[in-house]
């Protein structure tokens, strides 16, 4: 992996990874059908107090991280590499999500800064021309892998290109209908105003001595 950045003009938030592929021979590579499993090596970076608190939902209490802190599957992608000789640099697009029900998304959202330690595990098929001009195929060994430390800044820039200053929360249809009705009944101007009002009420109840007595 050579670099990473937001993919321009993508329909959804997408990180572009620059992948260098070396043929290792003088044969003409006609195509590569490349499958990549991308894992987050969560054990390979430190976490500040705020990050530890936010990661409680993913890994549990920090005191248990010796057994619960583990690698997370982020994505599995398939890429068709066009013909090349010797080596080539291709873009590997990886779509991002705000769906915090997915463990990897919850992990990435919890990070404040630094880098995300990633592991790329490759498999697939290479189609190439032999010296005689015959079409040959070869399998990519399962032990082919690469590491890359993705700056958290790149992730934030990628999400901001589509949802600047915003985030998305998935709720059930029933919960949404209740929230919508609450907003309509009180003639609130936006869902931000609606949620803020509910949170303010909950915080006021928690600080009320009568509430604590109950």
Predicted features by range, described:
Residues 173-190:
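Surface-exposed, Lys/Arg-rich phosphate-binding patches that contact polyanionic backbones
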Residues 39-50:
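Short aromatic-acidic-glycine turn motif
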Residues 54-109:
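Extended, solvent-exposed segments with strong compositional bias
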Residues 3-14, 22-30, 109-111:
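Short, solvent-exposed beta-strand/turn "edge" segments of beta-rich domains on protein surfaces
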Residues 189-211:
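Short, basic amphipathic alpha-helical segments that act as recognition/interaction helices
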């Amino acid at each position: 992996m050579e670099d990473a950045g937001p993919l321009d003009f993508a329909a959804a938030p997408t990180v572009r990874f620059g992948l260098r592929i070396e043929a290792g021979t003088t044969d003409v590579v006609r195509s590569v059908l490349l499958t990549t499993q991308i894992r987050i090596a969560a054990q390979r970076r430190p976490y500040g107090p705020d990050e530890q608190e936010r990661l409680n939902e993913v890994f549990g209490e920090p005191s248990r991280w010796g057994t619960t802190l583990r690698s997370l599957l982020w994505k599995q992608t398939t890429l068709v590499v066009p013909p090349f000789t010797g080596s080539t640099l291709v873009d590997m697009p990886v779509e991002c999500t705000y769906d915090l029900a997915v463990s990897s998304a919850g992990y990435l959202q919890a990070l404040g800064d630094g880098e995300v330690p990633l592991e790329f595990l490759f498999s697939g098929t290479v189609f190439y021309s032999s010296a005689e001009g015959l079409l040959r195929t070869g399998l990519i060994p399962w032990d082919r892998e690469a590491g890359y430390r993705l700056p958290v800044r790149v992730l934030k820039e990628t999400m901001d290109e589509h949802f600047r200053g915003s985030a998305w929360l998935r709720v059930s249809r029933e919960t949404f209908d209740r929230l919508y009705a609450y907003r309509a009944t009180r003639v609130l101007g936006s869902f931000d105003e609606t949620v803020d009002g509910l949170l303010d009420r909950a915080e006021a109840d928690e600080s009320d001595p009568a509430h604590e007595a109950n």
